[in-house]
Amino acid sequence: MYVHLALILGCWTVILQGAETDVGERADKRRPIWNLGHMVNAVKQIPTFLNDGANAIEADITFKGAVPTYSYHGTPCDFGRDCIRWEYFDVFLQTLRDYTTPGNSKYYEKFILFVLDLKTGSLNNNEVRKAGENIAKGLLKNYWNNGNNGGRAYVVLSLPDIAHYEFIRRFKEVLKAEGHENLLDKVGYDLSGPYLPSLPSLDSVHEAFRKAGVDGHVWLSDGLTNWAPLGDMARLKEIVERRDSENGFISKVYYWSVDKYSTTRTALDVGVDGIMTNFPYVIIDVLNENGYKDKYRLATYDDNPWETFKK
C-alpha cells in the first residue's frame, strides 16, 4: 500500500513539474525576434546564413514578364555583398523545402520563415495578376509539394508597390481553386512601397490591404541599404506606433539592412519584430547582451508570425 502511494505521489510530482515548465514557457513575456538573413539568393548561401544564426531568410524573385524565373538581386546592392548570386526559382523553392521539412537530411528546425521580395515593379496590371497566379502555383508545386509533406516554414510575400494588391487577390484565388485554401494560414503579406517619389501613407497601405482582401497576416517593412545614413527612423517609429494602436492593421514590423550592433540595439528599442541583416550573428550577439536578453529572444516555430506583440 505504501509503495503504491509513493508511486502515485511520485507521478504527481513529475506531472506538476512538467506543468510548471509549460507555464513558465507560456509565461515568457520577451518579444520574439525574426532574424532574417538578407539577400540569400543562391542555395549554397542558405546553410551559411542559418549557421550564422538566422531563423529566417529573404530572397529576391525576378520575373520575365509575369513568370518568376530567378532568385536574383543584381547591382547595386548592399555594401560588401555579391550582388549577382542566383538560382532558378523552382530549384530555389525545392531547396527551401528540403531545409524546412522534418525528416529531410537538410532540415533545420530553427528555419521558420522566409520572405520573397517580389520584383514586380516593371509589371503592368494584367501581368501583376498573372504573376500572383504563377507564384501560387510555384509555391504549391515546389515548396508545399502539392500539400503532401511539403515545407513547414511560414512565407511572407513582399511587394514593392501598394498598387499591386491584385497580385495578392489572384494568389489567394489560385490556392482556393486548387483546393489548398488551408495553406493561406502559412502566408503573410508586405506592401511597403513605392519609395519614389515618396512613401505612401499608412492609411493608403491599409486601404491597399483592404482591396487585396487581407485582414491580418500583415508584415510591414522599412529600411535603407547598409551604405546609406541611418536617419531618425521616423517612418519605422510611425509603423510601430500604428501596429500598437487600437485600429492597427499590422501584425509584425521588420527593419533592413541592419549590420551594426548599435543599429540593432536601436531597432530593438524602437520595437521591431524582425531585423534583416547581412550578418545574423550580430543580432544573436545583441539578443544575448545584458539589457536585451531579458526583453527579447529568437523566435521559434511555436511563435505565431501573424500575432501582434505590442510594446
Swiss-Prot record:
Molecular function via GO: lyase activity; metal ion binding; phosphoric diester hydrolase activity; toxin activity
Q: Which residues bind Mg(2+)?
A: E58, D60, D117
Per the UniProt entry, the signal peptide is 1-21
Q: Which reaction does it catalyse?
A: an N-(acyl)-sphingosylphosphocholine = an N-(acyl)-sphingosyl-1,3-cyclic phosphate + choline; an N-(acyl)-sphingosylphosphoethanolamine = an N-(acyl)-sphingosyl-1,3-cyclic phosphate + ethanolamine; a 1-acyl-sn-glycero-3-phosphocholine = a 1-acyl-sn-glycero-2,3-cyclic phosphate + choline; a 1-acyl-sn-glycero-3-phosphoethanolamine = a 1-acyl-sn-glycero-2,3-cyclic phosphate + ethanolamine
Question: What cofactors does the UniProt entry give for this protein?
Answer: Mg(2+)
* Propeptide position ranges: 22-26
Tissue specificity is:
Expressed by the venom gland.
Q: Name one GO cellular component term.
A: extracellular region
Keyword list, A-Z: Cytolysis, Dermonecrotic toxin, Disulfide bond, Hemolysis, Lipid degradation, Lipid metabolism, Lyase, Magnesium, Metal-binding, Secreted, Signal, Toxin, Zymogen
Q: Does the keyword Phosphoprotein apply?
A: no
Main location group: secreted
Q: What class of enzyme is it?
A: lyase
How cofactor binds (record note)? Binds 1 Mg(2+) ion per subunit.
As for subcellular location, the record says: Secreted
Q: Which residues form the active site?
A: H38, H73 (nucleophile)
Q: What is its EC number?
A: 4.6.1.-
BP-aspect Gene Ontology terms: killing of cells of another organism; lipid catabolic process
Disulphide bridges, residue numbers: C77-C83
Q: Which family does it belong to?
A: Belongs to the arthropod phospholipase D family. Class I subfamily.
What this protein is reported to do is described as: Dermonecrotic toxins cleave the phosphodiester linkage between the phosphate and headgroup of certain phospholipids (sphingolipid and lysolipid substrates), forming an alcohol (often choline) and a cyclic phosphate. This toxin acts on sphingomyelin (SM). It may also act on ceramide phosphoethanolamine (CPE), lysophosphatidylcholine (LPC) and lysophosphatidylethanolamine (LPE), but not on lysophosphatidylserine (LPS), and lysophosphatidylglycerol (LPG). It acts by transphosphatidylation, releasing exclusively cyclic phosphate products as second products.
List the protein's name.
Dermonecrotic toxin LlSicTox-alphaIII3i
Instruction: Give the originating organism.
Output: Loxosceles laeta
